[in-house]
């Protein structure tokens, strides 16, 4: 696939990095998960571009966006998205978010309905109970743990990431995603995401009751669900009761289960049925 063009744009008081794939339709603004970066969208960008323009942002504190010491909440991300659309001269976009990005996309569509043409929620945005949220954070614990680790070399970093059973099979796209986040530090290399930023983010997202946004959504919504857990069925991000409520309470929502995929595979792995579901939704079918 072709590599994206990187561009710095104005967020709400910070510079936000965008990975851009050109296309004649769109744009589709993509929002990643809590410890991810813009390169998590490479597989889907390869599917959707060049038909659609893909704009994948690094959230503040991640990737090549600026990393202020504080200010990690839905509210700040919404302001960043609104500001970057202004900076790019974009009135409306399709918004697609994965995991935390789905919560952000949902809230953005509720607060800025005039800016969202369609909304794709990829394995996120559900109103989870405290127990369900605890299970999710236990499931993503390995991703959180890597934020405090130092490895002797890039090769050692990648070797450690390859051991994760939940992100298999390994691919050039997954390797590129991890390479993108590596930076030098004393004693070797580490991720460029500071754990204190993610701790603030995690604390804030636990307080969000996403069901409060459901009735406010005015655009068509596609909810993509990963039916496989990371380590067990307990850490599924969209349990049946949760996704049932989403499609019942969001005025124009449909669901699509991406068979055989877990929370990471749903964006990192090839899946033709998923691709077709997205294409049909974008075309209004």
Describe the role of every protein-language-model region:
Residues 267-280:
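Post-His helix in hydrolase/transferase enzymes
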Residues 152-207:
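Conserved alpha/beta-hydrolase catalytic His-Asp/Glu region
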Residues 258-270:
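Catalytic histidine-centered segment of alpha/beta-hydrolase-like enzymes
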Residues 247-260:
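Catalytic histidine neighborhood in serine/cysteine hydrolases
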Residues 91-133:
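Conserved hydrolase catalytic core segment
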Residues 43, 55-96, 267:
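Active-site loop/oxyanion-hole signature of alpha/beta-hydrolase fold enzymes
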Residues 184-249:
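Conserved serine/cysteine hydrolase catalytic core
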Residues 17-64:
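Conserved HGGG/HGGXW glycine-rich cap/lid loop of the alpha/beta-hydrolase fold
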